[in-house]
Regions:
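Acetyl-CoA-dependent GNAT
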Residues: 1-53, 64-66, 70, 74, ...
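Internal amphipathic alpha-helical segments of the cytochrome P450 catalytic fold
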Residues: 7, 56, 90-91
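C-terminal "cap" of GNAT-fold acetyltransferases
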Residues: 39-43, 77-80, 84-91, 95-124
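Active-site acidic-Proline motif in GNAT/NAT acetyltransferases
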Residues: 51-53, 57, 85-86
Length: 124
């Protein structure tokens, strides 16, 4: 199988309250230095954003649960994400869902200023 992608919206009364974008690719295709034998499908959570006025209503948990379930259906045994260093609210949320910091970091310059990010991973 090739790459798979999904984009979800959480909507209430025609208002978008949250978004989640995730994908899976065989053998860590976007990171050859971390390739795994046998073409293992690896999930990647690209974004999970909740309207600040909707925080604490279970929307993030519902979107995350759906993403993790979809990863499993796609045959992923693990998934990764990148979170901004210092974003303690997001890191805490991810840890509550079972994600763990891996110790890997990167600097993203694609939006102009340097964004320092930490990798998190979860076994499914």
């Amino acid at each position: 199988d090739g790459e798979k992608r999904s984009f979800m919206l959480a909507v209430r009364d025609d208002a978008v309250l949250g978004i989640c974008h995730f994908s899976a690719a065989p053998n860590n295709a976007d990171r050859p230095e971390r390739a795994t034998p046998g073409g293992e499908m690896v999930g990647r959570l690209h974004s999970l954003y909740i309207d600040p006025d909707a925080l604490g209503q279970g929307i993030g948990h519902a979107l995350m649960s759906h993403a993790l379930s979809t990863f499993a259906v796609w045959g992923c045994e693990r998934a990764t994400l990148w979170v901004l260093e210092g974003n303690s609210r997001a890191i805490s949320f991810y840890e509550q869902q079972g994600w763990q910091l891996t110790g890997d970091t990167k600097v993203d310059r694609s939006f102009g200023p340097e964004l320092h990010e930490q990798e998190m991973a979860i076994c499914l």
